[in-house]
A protein has these predicted regions:
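Short, solvent-exposed loop/turn segments at secondary-structure junctions
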Residues: 2, 42-43, 92-93, 132-133, ...
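Beta-strand scaffold of nucleotide-dependent catalytic cores
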Residues: 86-89, 128, 136-153
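Short, conserved beta-strand/beta-arch hydrophobic-aromatic motifs that form part
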Residues: 71
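Active-site loop ensemble at the mouth of alpha/beta enzyme cores that anchors a bound cofactor
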Residues: 97-114
Length: 200
């Protein structure tokens, strides 16, 4: 997404950001006659984690017990229930820190790690029961054809939470094969079927 140049006065930043966003999204409409593997609206929807969870259920995949909320009382009750839990932001985010780029990852969360209520209420988050993984699969669908890789996340540093944390340790990946029972539903055009990250 385009960012507002630092030269812009603080009073004008919101307006400039709106203009940049409008131009960015309108730009896609200039290529209506082009062949898209993923049309803009589908690619955008694919980045929405709530949409991904709904799509997973639609095609018959099981998802962990999930709470999406910014209500501190609900969040604390969920985290204090039986089992281990994780937190995911609704979107990915990159930022500069001490001269290097870092990003958001899935994180383990406990009642002790939760911030004060005012911070919990500031923005919604995705809270889920932690599911032990044998491996993770990254799948790309192109119509009825799919290609995927099996990531042995349990061998990676931090891989029990998010394979990307230790992705530098990946030497090779085997092909991922999906169960035949899920293929008819997963190969249908769902509007945002660019890729499906499936935890197994």
């Amino acid at each position: 997404m385009p960012e507002v140049p630092k030269v812009i006065d603080v009073r004008d930043r919101q307006f400039v950001q709106m203009e940049l966003d409008a131009a960015f999204h309108a730009h896609k409409s200039l290529f209506r006659k082009a062949f898209w593997i993923n049309k803009g609206i589908s690619a955008d929807a694919c980045e929405l984690k709530i949409h991904q969870l709904l799509m997973a259920q639609t095609v018959g995949l099981l998802i962990p017990r999930t709470l999406i909320s910014n209500k501190p009382k609900e969040i604390r009750a969920f985290i204090e229930s039986t089992g281990e839990h994780i937190y995911k932001p609704l979107t990915g985010y990159l930022w500069q820190e001490q001269g290097s780029v870092t990003q958001t990852f899935t994180a383990k969360v406990t009642a002790e790690l939760l911030p004060e209520n005012s911070l919990l209420a500031a923005t919604p988050g995705i809270f889920q029961t932690k599911v032990p993984k044998k491996y993770e699969a990254r799948i790309q669908f192109f119509g009825r054809f799919y290609g995927g890789v099996r990531i042995e996340s349990h061998t990676l540093s931090g891989g029990d939470l998010d394979w990307r944390i230790g992705q530098g340790g990946i030497k090779a990946c085997a092909p991922a094969v999906l169960p035949r029972r899920n293929l008819p539903q997963m190969s249908q055009p769902h509007g945002a079927a660019r890729h499906c990250q499936w935890r197994i």
